[in-house]
Amino acid sequence: MKQFSAKYALILLATAGQALAASTQGISEDLYNRLVEMATISQAAYADLCNIPSTIIKGEKIYNAQTDINGWILRDDTSKEIITVFRGTGSDTNLQLDTNYTLTPFDTLPQCNDCEVHGGYYIGWISVQDQVESLVKQQASQYPDYALTVTGHSLGASMAALTAAQLSATYDNVRLYTFGEPRSGNQAFASYMNDAFQVSSPETTQYFRVTHSNDGIPNLPPADEGYAHGGVEYWSVDPYSAQNTFVCTGDEVQCCEAQGGQGVNDAHTTYFGMTSGACTW
């Protein structure tokens, strides 16, 4: 599988014309470490949260047998946050959700005007909505000064996006970190997320959409089927580092999506050197 180096990325962006103005190379070490921490949790979700950071307390499991949606409620008393994480695709049942591209009204969030979301992931969301909202409410009531963080990889990333959208209608302090996220909804949904999560600037955003090299999943479902991405994109190229992370705030096809990757490839399963469920970090 072809890997994209930082040098190659710079050459590519240098030829991207106007898109280059909306892409900058390098992020702070603090932000980079934060992205790696959330990626660790998201990748560990494939293996029952193996090797998660020592400060994190594992809480209640989220699960629905019909959709095979898996997740957990976690807590970190050091960073003062309640974390909801969703596992990515782990079964044929999940794959059926992945391939249901029918855009569906986001009826559980009427504030999201004209919003339509990925049909399969919406089925996944409504299958666990009651569990998620109940468990988050319990934790938020017990720890009212804690931030709410939602994260996940692949299918788990889109589940995280729908969950964060729903929680943002009730709570003010919701943050979203996704890794290899498919397009989760239409332009109205992307616009709602951008407004709700202050995506107008990397300095204010609370929606960190992390991509890697030529990961093919962010190119799905196709934009010409009515789908769009939200969030500020943080594009990691190899060798991964804070300096080799690009901040992409313009056209969504300028960074990862411009590499032409399609579907599950090496760049999708591995983020910051961590492979989904491998637990070798």
UniProtKB/Swiss-Prot annotation:
CDD domains noted in UniProt: Lipase_3 (cd00519)
Chief localization: secreted
Catalytic activity: feruloyl-polysaccharide + H2O = ferulate + polysaccharide
Regulation affecting activity: Inhibited by the specific serine esterase inhibitor diisopropylfluorophosphate.
Signal peptide: 1-21
pH-activity dependence text: Optimum pH is 5.0.
Biological role: Involved in degradation of plant cell walls. Hydrolyzes the feruloyl-arabinose ester bond in arabinoxylans, and the feruloyl-galactose ester bond in pectin. Binds to cellulose.
PANTHER family noted in UniProt: FUNGAL LIPASE-LIKE DOMAIN-CONTAINING PROTEIN-RELATED, TRIACYLGLYCEROL LIPASE, PUTATIVE (AFU_ORTHOLOGUE AFUA_6G06510)-RELATED
Name by which UniProt lists this protein: Feruloyl esterase A
